[in-house]
Amino acid sequence: MSIQHAPVLTCTQLSWRHQGATILEGVDLQVRAGESLALVGPNGSGKSTLIKLLCGVLAASAGEVRLFGQPLSDYLRRDIAQRIAVVEQHSETLDAISVRDAVELGRTPWLSALAPWSAEDDRQVEQALQAVDLTHLSKRRWHSLSGGERQRAQIGRAMAQQPQILLLDEPTNHLDIQHQLSILGLVQRLPVTTVIALHDLNQALTCDRVAVLDKGRLIALGAPEEVLVPELLLQTFGVHAHYLVDPEDGSRLLRFRPAG
């Protein structure tokens, strides 16, 4: 994926506090147009909170988020949803609806009394279903889908929004390895700027850049192999790590062992 240098989403000294506890503190981050940015860190490091702040679901306690150079607080919710789509870990969806119904929900930000459902909305839904390879399952009921199929449908719903930025909060959690690889491959092929929170550091190696959070602070940012070095992994995750080279394709992979 080619990376342009213009930031599309920025945060400056971004902080969030809840019930007296500091969850995120002083985060400075620029997301570049066209890039894939991985957010990694131990449990409770602030990854999910940062994603909620970047899309306006949470309001910052201090600092600022800017979308295309304008304060996020200046945008209406509808305007944000036309630019940013979010795929959460656990998205609630009624079991009775079909796959197509779920994907059609992505058109909501574009509909109004003056702009009712049209052929263009049908076209966007069809494109989204094709992008996530669910056209053949479009009439299936939600309750009959596997975990991987549900997650693909959620990504399809997000793509039907026609976003320029896609935020994903650990989209491969609770999926088997086949579905993990399928979802990550799908995300990498999407023609949007992507910010993705991940637990698996080897998955983060496939992104353009990696941001490491620890105890609510951004402690490292850069190219994956420049950031995910043994010293940082020991300090942040409490594990020893070294790189291996895959003889099949020459790619580098992390191998871990317990510290101590």
Question: Model features per residue range: what roles?
Answer:
Residues C55:
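Helix-to-loop junction immediately C-terminal to a conserved catalytic motif
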Residues G63-P71, I80, R140:
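Conserved ABC transporter NBD signature motif
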Residues P116, R141-L145, E149:
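Conserved ABC ATPase signature
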Residues L166-E170, L175:
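Catalytic Walker B motif of ABC-type/P-loop ATPase nucleotide-binding domains
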